[in-house]
């Protein structure tokens, strides 16, 4: 039961951090204005596309980690039983 509670708390903390990152971003600056320079342009994280990109990046990294875990375990198991 405590494992579920711990997972729920960590999910809550990560969602709070995500909310802070998304909604505490600086106000948008017109990227094409002459006063804006590309090296000083601030990335805004409260648009739909940036949130969608972050979610997709998170899912991609999780799926990559799961695949590598499976692949490494499969290789380890086949190498281990090869001697028997």
Swiss-Prot record:
Signal peptide, first to last residue: 1-26
Main location: virion
Keyword presence, Iron: no
Physiological role: Envelope glycoprotein necessary for proper maturation of gM and modulation of its membrane fusion activity. Also plays a critical role in virion morphogenesis.
InterPro entries: Herpes_glycoprotein_N_domain (IPR005211), HSV_GN (IPR034707)
Membrane disposition: Single-pass type I membrane protein
Keywords linked to the UniProt accession: Disulfide bond, Host Golgi apparatus, Host membrane, Membrane, Signal, Transmembrane, Transmembrane helix, Viral envelope protein, Virion
TM regions (residue ranges): 48-68
Subcellular compartments: Virion membrane; Host membrane; Host Golgi apparatus, Host trans-Golgi network
Source superkingdom: Viruses
Residues on Virion surface side: 27-47
Entries under Pfam families matching the protein: Herpes_UL73
Record topology, Intravirion segments: 69-84
Name by which UniProt lists this protein: Envelope glycoprotein N
Classification via HAMAP family: HSV_GN
One Gene Ontology CC term in the entry: host cell membrane
Family: Belongs to the herpesviridae glycoprotein N family.
Subunit structure, as described in the record: Interacts (via N-terminus) with gM (via N-terminus). The gM-gN heterodimer forms the gCII complex.
């Amino acid at each position: 039961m405590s494992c579920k509670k711990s997972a729920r708390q960590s999910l809550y903390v990560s969602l709070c951090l995500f909310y802070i990152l998304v909604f505490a971003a600086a106000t948008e600056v017109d990227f094409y204005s002459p006063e804006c320079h590309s090296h000083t342009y601030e990335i805004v994280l409260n648009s739909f596309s940036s949130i969608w990109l972050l979610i997709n990046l998170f899912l991609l990294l999780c799926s990559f980690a799961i695949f590598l875990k499976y692949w490494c375990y499969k290789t380890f198991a086949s190498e281990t039983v090869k001697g028997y």
